[in-house]
């Protein structure tokens, strides 16, 4: 599995719009055959920073993704709304998706 984490720092005036700005790209990517997950989170410390956590089945699926029209479109417009070059971690890891955290179990409801 190809596991990728990308930090985007968005112009403060565009931060609240970010989820709607990336929605079409997000939905298209989630629809790709080799996509395992594609999830956005907003930083609780830096309100104009968003973190994308994504995974693809293998490097071939990742290649299909970066060759897609929706990826190319995203790359074309994003420079207008970011304030720093995105930071990325891109690694190949064993597995095919999320696992359960062994150290935690929800408390039973009383």
Positions of the model-derived regions?
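N-terminal/domain-start segments enriched in small and hydrophobic, helix-friendly residues
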Residues: 2, 7, 21, 25, ...
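Short, well-ordered beta-strand segments in beta-rich or mixed alpha/beta enzyme
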Residues: 2-9, 39-66, 92
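N-terminal first-folded block
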Residues: 2-40
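Intrinsically disordered, low-complexity acidic/polar segments
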Residues: 15-17, 49, 61, 97
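An amphipathic, aromatic/His-enriched active-site/gating alpha helix that lines ligand/cofactor pockets
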Residues: 24-37, 55-90
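Glycine-rich beta-strand-turn "strand-cap" elements at beta-sheet edges
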Residues: 41-48, 76-110
């Amino acid at each position: 599995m190809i596991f990728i984490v990308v930090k985007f720092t968005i112009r403060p005036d565009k931060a609240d719009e970010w989820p709607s700005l990336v929605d079409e790209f997000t939905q298209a990517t989630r629809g790709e055959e080799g996509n395992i997950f594609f999830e956005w989170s907003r930083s609780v410390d830096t309100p104009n920073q968003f973190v994308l956590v994504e995974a693809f089945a293998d490097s071939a699926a990742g290649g299909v993704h970066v060759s897609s029209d929706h990826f190319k479109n995203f790359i074309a417009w994003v420079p207008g709304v970011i304030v720093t070059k995105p930071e990325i971690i891109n690694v190949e890891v064993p597995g095919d998706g999320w696992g359960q955290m062994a150290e935690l179990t929800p408390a039973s409801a009383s």
